[in-house]
A protein has these predicted regions:
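Bacterial N-terminal signal peptides that target proteins for export
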Residues: 1-5
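Terminus-proximal functional modules
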Residues: 6, 12-187
Length: 187
């Protein structure tokens, strides 16, 4: 099933490009390994396209990433950081540190890790020429009406929506987790 979804994704991604595109599929059951493999692929010119966490036929619970590159494209190179935790306070702290270092949100998923249980995984990207810093705000609540109110408050403060998951966090149980960001500086 997952392979069918990935192949469908690849065909959709491939249909909107100008010229040939090369894809790299990465799959592992450790987020630390995934970050290392993503950065190795990035050094070869690949860029993050999408992710999903779940049970695969061959590997059990895995996080699966799709990366792509256009052959011969000498464009920007990227660095990647994966954040994975069940604690919203830890995620907020790690997002803040990464944002200050110029990392930009590119995706998130839920992943059942062997060691951490059900975690929110956030993928961040920084180009080799990044000169912008970001501030991130993580909102987590079990009530969708509260989330709507908090999103509007953050929007009035200049935060833009990045992504959302429904997750089981360490303190709040099942929560809607939203991530927002705003630009805070340029060199």
């Amino acid at each position: 099933m997952l392979m069918t979804i990935c192949l469908t994704l690849l065909s959709l991604l491939g249909s909107s490009t100008d010229g040939p595109v090369e894809y790299k599929l990465l799959a592992t059951n450790k987020t630390s390994t995934m970050e290392k493999e993503m950065n190795q692929a990035a050094a070869e010119g690949f860029r993050f396209e999408g992710t999903m966490g779940g049970e695969t036929a061959a590997g059990g619970n895995e996080i699966v990433m799709i990366m792509s590159r256009k052959p011969g494209d000498g464009g920007s190179r990227y660095n990647y950081k994966l954040l994975a935790t069940k604690k919203t306070s830890t995620m907020q702290k790690e997002l803040s540190e990464a944002g200050g270092a110029g990392f930009l949100y590119t995706g998130q998923t839920i992943y059942d890790s062997a060691f951490g249980g059900r975690e929110v995984v956030v993928i961040l990207e920084r180009s080799d020429s990044a000169k912008t810093a970001y501030e991130y705000k993580l909102l987590a609540t079990s009530r969708t009406s509260t989330m709507g109110k908090e999103l509007n408050e953050a929007g009035r403060a200049g935060f833009v929506f990045c992504g959302m998951t429904v997750a089981e966090t360490a303190f709040g149980g099942r929560e809607v987790v939203s991530i927002l960001r705003r630009q805070v500086g340029r060199e």
